[in-house]
């Protein structure tokens, strides 16, 4: 995890943007990405999803991508701290990425290529959390079913909050929800290949768990990405508690 930046000092020092595109993050609309990302990050912090500078959030708005900075206290982010990229943009090398606004003294998110992977498949918002429940679920799946297994759960009302795939509606109560799991890597950007493979093998998924790390969740709108992330986190916590009681996650497997 990057060393934490004292974001309050950065804010006080002002900004010196090479492109002078401050207008991109200035809006009175609370739903504007530059306002919405800080608000979402504050909520995620209170929920324990982005503790200790971990995690991140990005929103695509037309041909622009708005991204929270890396290595900062997420609950303190302000609109002027947001990076803006042109979309589409190359994932690699990082030097080729088309930033059109870079706040001074802040580092672009290490999650950037993973966010771009989600946007390339049509997502409009991608959220990365370090939820304890997501981490615990990856450990339980590995111990019970092995490293190649997905997280699977059925016959729980909350799975109806997760899409079955683009244009395929939402999961039904009796369906089995499957979330792929990839291995963690020493550096965040190195997760990109694993995420791409998981999406290729599971083209309908809206989330990928990262073992011993957290989860990436995306949606067709920022609101959908947020509510899907909430539903998944609720399901992960429930799964941990069910395991304590010896209750199966996927009733369809026991029939």
From Swiss-Prot:
Its cofactor is Zn(2+). Binds 1 zinc ion per subunit. Pfam families: Aldolase_II (PF00596). Its main location: cytoplasm. Zn(2+) binds at residues 128, 130, 213. Pathway: Amino-acid biosynthesis; L-methionine biosynthesis via salvage pathway; L-methionine from S-methyl-5-thio-alpha-D-ribose 1-phosphate: step 2/6. It is an enzyme of class 4 (lyase). InterPro entries: Aldolase_II/adducin_N, Aldolase_II/adducin_N_sf, MethylthioRu-1-P_deHdtase_MtnB, Salvage_MtnB_euk. Substrate binds at residue 111. It is found in: Cytoplasm. The keyword Amino-acid biosynthesis applies. Keywords: Amino-acid biosynthesis, Cytoplasm, Lyase, Metal-binding, Methionine biosynthesis, Zinc. GO terms for biological process: L-methionine salvage from methylthioadenosine. Belongs to the aldolase class II family. MtnB subfamily. Catalyzes the dehydration of methylthioribulose-1-phosphate (MTRu-1-P) into 2,3-diketo-5-methylthiopentyl-1-phosphate (DK-MTP-1-P). This is Methylthioribulose-1-phosphate dehydratase. It comes from Talaromyces stipitatus (strain ATCC 10500 / CBS 375.48 / QM 6759 / NRRL 1006). The gene is mde1.
């Amino acid at each position: 995890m990057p060393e934490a930046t004292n974001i309050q000092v950065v804010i006080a020092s002002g900004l010196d943007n090479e492109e002078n595109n401050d207008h991109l993050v200035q809006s009175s609309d609370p739903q504007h990405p530059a306002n919405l990302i800080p608000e979402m990050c504050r909520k995620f912090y209170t929920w324990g999803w982005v503790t200790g500078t971990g995690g991140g959030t990005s929103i695509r708005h037309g041909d622009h991508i708005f991204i929270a900075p890396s290595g900062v206290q997420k609950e303190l982010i302000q609109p002027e701290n947001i990076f803006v990229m042109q979309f589409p943009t190359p994932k690699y090398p990082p030097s080729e990425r088309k930033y059109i606004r870079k706040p001074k003294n802040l580092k672009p998110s290490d999650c950037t290529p993973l966010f771009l992977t989600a946007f390339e498949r049509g997502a409009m918002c991608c959220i990365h959390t370090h939820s304890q429940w997501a981490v615990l679920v990856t450990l339980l799946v590995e111990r019970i079913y092995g490293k190649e297994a997905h997280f699977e759960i059925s016959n729980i009302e909350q799975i109806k909050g997760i899409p079955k795939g683009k244009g395929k509606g939402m999961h039904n109560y009796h369906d089995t929800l499957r979330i792929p799991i990839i291995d963690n890597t020493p550096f965040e950007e190195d997760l990109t290949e694993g995420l791409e493979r998981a999406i290729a093998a599971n083209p309908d998924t809206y989330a990928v768990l990262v073992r011993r790390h957290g989860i990436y969740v995306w949606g067709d709108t920022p609101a959908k990405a947020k509510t899907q992330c909430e539903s998944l986190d609720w399901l992960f916590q429930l799964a941990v508690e069910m395991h304590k009681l010896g209750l199966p996650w996927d009733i369809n497997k026991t029939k």
